[in-house]
Amino acid sequence: ILALGIFISFRILDIPDLSVDGTFTLGVAVSVMQAFNGDPIKGILLSIVAGAIAGSVTGILITKLNVQPILAGIITMTALYSINLKIMDRPNISLYKKDTIFTMAQKYFGDYYKLAAAGIVLVIAAVLLFWFLKTQAGMSLRATGDNEYMVRASSINSDRMKIMGFAIANALVSLSGAMYAQYSSAGDSNSGTGMLVVG
């Protein structure tokens, strides 16, 4: 899931997004707090929304404020570090004896519950992403990464496409963070370090 998110920004949009480390941890923070309060599914869904918002901020910095992509990613990542600490209210949180989507899946899939839960989420994310890329909006997004000037000549708002691309990419990265937190039954404010390289 992390690789799918990085694939959108680096390969489709052809723009480096260094905010990935912060967005991954954002997914961890949102997911672990919701799971800690007894609603792991809501945690997964909210992490997707939070990641999309963070990605949109990076996109707006690049398109509307003309900030260089690398600097925009660093700005967003730095801001997210403080936001993530505020969400979690402490450096780390344990989900010991708390319900997660994996413990919920154990009731249905037995010994293979972790693999099954992760596989189901991955398949859903991949199918939705590749379906989207075949729609008109998805093709416009791909065209923006290939040739932005031609896209503008075709009266397509390339800035909007970039913002949408960053939103989708970071939503997927945040989702991967949410899954990781519930898989490991713990959330750490530094868990996103190096995720760009991993992806």
In which residue ranges do the predicted regions lie?
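Single transmembrane alpha-helix segments in multi-pass membrane proteins
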Residues: I1-D39, I44, L61-L65
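Alpha-helical transmembrane segments within multi-pass membrane transporters and channels
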Residues: D39-T78, L122-A126
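Helix-loop-helix "hairpin" substructures at the membrane interface of multi-pass membrane proteins
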Residues: A54, D111-D188
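Extracellular/periplasmic helix-loop junction at the C-terminal end of a transmembrane helix
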Residues: L80-K107
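Pore- or pathway-lining transmembrane helices of multi-pass membrane proteins that form conduits
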Residues: K64-M88, S191-G199
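Hydrophobic alpha-helical segments embedded in the membrane of multi-pass proteins
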Residues: I1-G5, G22-L26, I53-V57, V123, ...
